[in-house]
């Protein structure tokens, strides 16, 4: 599923996008967080598929799963 996500410095300044489009993963996540439904996204972006939306969510989850969190030391 992650193969649907593309990172190319020549496309959207290297931000992760849905492969073959200029639709950033961030846009999909932001719209969903603002209350947009999958149907809303599919209507607004005809080139987008349900699998693309799922790939964006999976990509975001993977990025968070591998994030390194540095906690401030207690003084």
Task: Briefly describe each language-model feature range.
Residues 5, 18, 68-69:
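Generic preference for hydrophobic/aromatic residues in regular secondary structure cores
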Residues 13-59:
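Amphipathic, hydrophobic secondary-structure cores in small proteins
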């Amino acid at each position: 599923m992650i193969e649907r996500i593309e990172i190319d410095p020549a496309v959207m300044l290297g931000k992760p996008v849905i492969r073959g489009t200029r639709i950033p993963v961030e846009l999909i996540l932001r719209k969903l967080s603002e209350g947009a439904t999958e149907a809303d996204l599919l209507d607004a972006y005809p080139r987008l598929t349900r699998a693309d939306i799922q790939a964006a969510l999976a990509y975001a989850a993977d990025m968070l799963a591998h994030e390194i969190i540095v906690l401030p030391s207690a003084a």
